Amino acid sequence: MDVMMFVLWFAVGFVFGSVPSGLWLVKAIHGIDIREYGSKNIGSTNVFRTVGGKTAVLVLLCDAGKGIIAVMIAQSMTGGDLYAMLFAAIGALLGHNYSLFLGFKGGRGVATGLGLLIFLMPKVSGICFIVWLAIVLATRYVSLGSCVGAFCAPCLAWYFGYPLPVFLFAAVA
């Protein structure tokens, strides 16, 4: 695969990742700009704290789903080329964090990263979720659970023998 194809898959991922699900869903359902409330973040944690669980679950699913969709498109169009999928994944994550629709501002990438982990490394994502849940239940800090879960991802990717590019993605995502 040539360099232009990597750029293409990165761009596809970036556009999908740029969709500000939290902002648009909260605006559509509740008529408010979520960036004016709580932590001012558009992610599901701030949505949960500001407008409640139902909308937060929708935001979480959309943020996770947009990364998965970008990678699935790359997978189906390239016959499963791992590098195309990873470039789409990196694009989706960076698009979420630096959204085209929000002047290159965005979320923290936790839900989008989770969706990418679920698709690319299902065993790893399941264990990371259990670790995240245990930390959140024990401390009531979602951010701490997210950080510990993110730290576990590359360790588990290495342990389960995922290919080096997937391990590196887990390490930097």
Please annotate each region the language model reported:
Residues 23-56:
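Cytosolic, membrane-interface loops and tails of multi-pass inner-membrane proteins
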Residues 2-29:
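N-terminal signal-anchor transmembrane alpha helix
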